[in-house]
Amino acid sequence: MATPSRTSWADVADADPAPAPAPAANGPARPDRSSYVPPHLRNRGASSGGGAAAPPPSSSSSSAPPPRAAPGLLAPRPAAAGMGRMGGGGGGGGFGGPRRWDREPNPFGNDGDAAAGAGDEPEVFDAHQNTGINFDAYEDIPVETSGREVPPPVGTFAEIDLGQALNDNIRRCKYVRPTPVQRYAIPISLAGRDLMACAQTGSGKTAAFCFPIISGIMRGPPAQRPQRGGMRTACPLALILSPTRELSMQIHEEARKFSYQTGVRVVVAYGGAPINQQLRDLERGVDILVATPGRLVDLLERARVSLQSIRYLALDEADRMLDMGFEPQVRRIVEQMDMPPPGARQTMLFSATFPKEIQRMASDFLENYIFLAVGRVGSSTDLIVQRVEFVQEADKRSHLMDLLHAQRDSATPGKPTLTLVFVETKRGADSLEHWLCMNGFPATSIHGDRNQQEREYALRSFKSGHTPILVATDVAARGLDIPHVAHVVNFDLPNDIDDYVHRIGRTGRAGKSGLATAFFNENNSSMARSLAELMQESNQEVPAWLSRYAARPSYGGGGGRNRRSGGGSRFGGRDFRRDSSSGRGGGDYYGGGSSGGAGGYGGSSAYGGGGYGGGAGAPSAWD
């Protein structure tokens, strides 16, 4: 049995807290376009010549109320003072009349800040950790794009015309410069192209699809949303689908930061929570709907949401959306409801893994798309140190205790080290949480049987450091951004190498370092080869005993559905169209693509077939 290291975590854990953002010196600038009307100002009952009585003018303006709009059309914007071009209440005013968008309520409900005046930054921007991103770790990342006429990448946000209001929010979020996936994905999306992007967890994918969507809605023509008699049916312009409620809430939180004082209204809908409040939020108007598939199908069947006005469709963690039972729901939403077809809408798919079979399914939703693969940050800088230790089932708890004691002994006094422990079952999560607490290690747990309030409380308690150990099933493995996780422990290894990749991606985020420890025994034999290959591709030390397991013929075929066969990566870092087009002129089709060090990332044009290893050149495995 391998002896656990009592100090290894300290060599790689990033203990620096995220610096608190300083308040902005200037108030928000006004957007520079006037075509957009926020949802709560549309189709108002005010009229200068109709039968409806006009509401009283806003206290901040003496202008006349807007004329009544024809059915199905948008009302002209009222000329309220201070509203800003493209303003109009920030989506928070319901149907009660115009509001100054510089008085938009804090999205996080800070009642003490009634108005975000000049120099006042809302609480929503507090504790943002982007200034802690280690951009030096991104400098040598290989990037590949394939498809026709790929737009060139950008180096700074100043090169991208996103609009003044959105640029102000980028500064409020302390975004210094784009991450690699943002450098490539944002110009592609702003050019109106469909996109399939494969990029590391924690690399800024949410902003990569939110920025173009918000900018496009602000700049786009007024939407002619349908009227459905007396029923209030929400007709969003953009739909963002995600597989879990936690991830949906996280995307919603980030999107509200980015859309602050732009007039773009963001609403979230997910299962496991009362639907009535979500219906009320939708009735107030929605531009961007963030939803899980199950709850969205429910809303569509109730005719409370229509997708016929959708201009933008984004799938986050798209590989999971098209796998593990989600595909029928996603296909029903995208293909069998009233959503515009590919070509009439813009579609963006993002994930950390894109196996070939998932790419084939996803291509049904796309038209003339660009494939983007961004190499793993830790492939050359070893930001995530992976350790695999042989531990029998009966010894796992005592072995975990040894690791936690070593971690506690080496920790900085007063600064808890966040540790995420993954187990396979819900019962196992509850049992291990109780055992840890009984042995002096404050812990909490999150899994599918917890109600929404319990899950939110557990995440808050963990993020704050009040309970620095979180025991979780895979419900927390996908997409969640939990800053400052120093150590991920795979107490129970998953059966699929993709799930392992997503689990360890909870640490080493934003270019920071982290440690991932896995407990391996005979029950995990089918994972041996895939695990050894992943560690080799990531420049990790592979234990000799694991190499022997991997070499055994009886264990060679495991590791889940995405085991490598031939060239390319099991994680889908290579456009499957390249392989299917080989031998029949595929090179001409992809003449617009680029690879390797394009745009200053990655110093070579050969790095293993798209930055994921398995081809010619230096291997580079990335999730």
UniProtKB/Swiss-Prot annotation:
Residues 399-550 form the Helicase C-terminal domain. It catalyses: ATP + H2O = ADP + phosphate + H(+). Its EC number is 3.6.4.13. Residues 186-372 form the Helicase ATP-binding domain. A motif (DEAD box) lies at residues 316-319. It is an enzyme of class 3 (hydrolase). A motif (Q motif) lies at residues 155-183. Residues 10-29, 70-83 have a biased composition (Low complexity). Residues 1-120, 553-595 are annotated as: Disordered. Residues 54-69 have a biased composition (Pro residues). Residues 572-581 have a biased composition (Basic and acidic residues). SMART domains: DEXDc (SM00487), HELICc (SM00490). It comes from the Eukaryota. SUPFAM superfamilies: P-loop containing nucleoside triphosphate hydrolases. Gene3D superfamilies: P-loop containing nucleotide triphosphate hydrolases. Residues 84-97, 555-571, 583-595 have a biased composition (Gly residues). It holds the Pfam family Helicase_C. Keywords: ATP-binding, Helicase, Hydrolase, Nucleotide-binding, RNA-binding. Signal peptide: none annotated. The Q motif is unique to and characteristic of the DEAD box family of RNA helicases and controls ATP binding and hydrolysis. This is DEAD-box ATP-dependent RNA helicase 52C. It comes from Oryza sativa subsp. japonica (Rice).
